[in-house]
Amino acid sequence: MRVLGLETSCDETGVALYDSERGLLADALFSQIDLHRVYGGVVPELASRDHVKRMLPLIRQVLDESGCTPADIDAIAYTAGPGLVGALLVGASCAQAMAFAWGVPAVGVHHMEGHLLAPMLEEQPPRFPFVALLVSGGHTQLVRVDGIGRYQLLGESVDDAAGEAFDKTAKLIGLGYPGGPEIARLAELGTPGRFVFPRPMTDRPGLDFSFSGLKTFTLNTWQRCVEAGDDSEQTRCDIALAFQTAVVETLLIKCRRALKQTGLKNLVIAGGVSANQALRSGLEKMLGEMKGQVFYARPRFCTDNGAMIAYAGCQRLLAGQHDGPAISVQPRWPMESLPAV
């Protein structure tokens, strides 16, 4: 089965073609970072308009690169949520229109299920069951995964997601957008131990997260330095390192708890923040000590992309699931409500 996947949940337009027998045939992505950088964050209306502009050229590019034509497409998968409603509607409308015109089924995919299954595109994919850490700009969740659609939420952020905290913290100390890569870049130049930030909600039982207070702690630390006349680039680097270390160690502590609680040995990390090298290194060390294994997608499939949507959609289509012709999206959509495959 050849499935065309469309991703338009936020600020990246992703298109990919996945073959259930041959694997990924082609993928293309356009990032709107430059469009939104001047505003310091994503502007939903601009994101929607740019998706409209980019979608068809990217589809043509993927078809050309794969050597396929519309007649070779067996189905279309699209991100139906969660995400920005206008952006989601662009992808859903395009998918349903093409499905009608080409006479093929369409299926709406849960954005975070796409992220969760992205490591399945690698040469050594994880096997069920496992614990998944979904960590992105909009979500920070720990999930027990027993199969596709068989999800048990173990813990989640009660306020800011980790990726959101990275972006907001970067803005507070005068860094550019997107903030996550900027924080990581400066952290490499930071002085270890100059600042020590708290590890939120690690001194109590449970698997929930909270990063809002850490963001405030960072702001207060930066303001004290500025008032003391020390707003140097090195101070920014030292604060970036302290912040990143606090986030990473908080995630590590919670992941260790989740693995012990479930008795599982394998961990999947997915979402944009999973590209962070400090987090990857920490998890690899921790899982080595626990005689387990950590799995993640290649860096370009950690952020939003069409490949993960094409793959996730293909699994549901092969199980006989597909949508009717109505155009429907879900900006808020609990992943544990998905049907099992």
From Swiss-Prot:
Catalytic activity, EC: 2.3.1.234
Keyword Iron among record annotations: yes
Chief location of this protein within or outside the cell: cytoplasm
Acetylation among keywords: no
Compartment annotation: Cytoplasm
Keywords on record: Acyltransferase, Cytoplasm, Iron, Metal-binding, Transferase, tRNA processing
Positions of substrate binding: L134, V135, S136, G137, G138, D167, G180, N276
GO biological process: tRNA threonylcarbamoyladenosine modification
Protein residues bound to Fe cation: H111, H115, D304
Leading EC class: transferase
Domain of life: Bacteria
Cofactor(s), by name: Fe(2+)
Reaction(s) this enzyme catalyzes, per UniProt: L-threonylcarbamoyladenylate + adenosine(37) in tRNA = N(6)-L-threonylcarbamoyladenosine(37) in tRNA + AMP + H(+)
Cofactor remark: Binds 1 Fe(2+) ion per subunit.
Gene Ontology MF terms: iron ion binding; N(6)-L-threonylcarbamoyladenine synthase activity
Pfam families, A to Z: TsaD
PANTHER family in the cross-refs: TRNA N6-ADENOSINE THREONYLCARBAMOYLTRANSFERASE, TRNA N6-ADENOSINE THREONYLCARBAMOYLTRANSFERASE, MITOCHONDRIAL
HAMAP family per record: TsaD
Free-text function comment from the UniProt entry: Required for the formation of a threonylcarbamoyl group on adenosine at position 37 (t(6)A37) in tRNAs that read codons beginning with adenine. Is involved in the transfer of the threonylcarbamoyl moiety of threonylcarbamoyl-AMP (TC-AMP) to the N6 group of A37, together with TsaE and TsaB. TsaD likely plays a direct catalytic role in this reaction.
Family recorded in the similarity comment: Belongs to the KAE1 / TsaD family.
Protein name per its UniProtKB record: tRNA N6-adenosine threonylcarbamoyltransferase
Organism (species): Pseudomonas aeruginosa (strain LESB58)
Upper classification of the organism: Bacteria, Pseudomonadati, Pseudomonadota, Gammaproteobacteria, Pseudomonadales
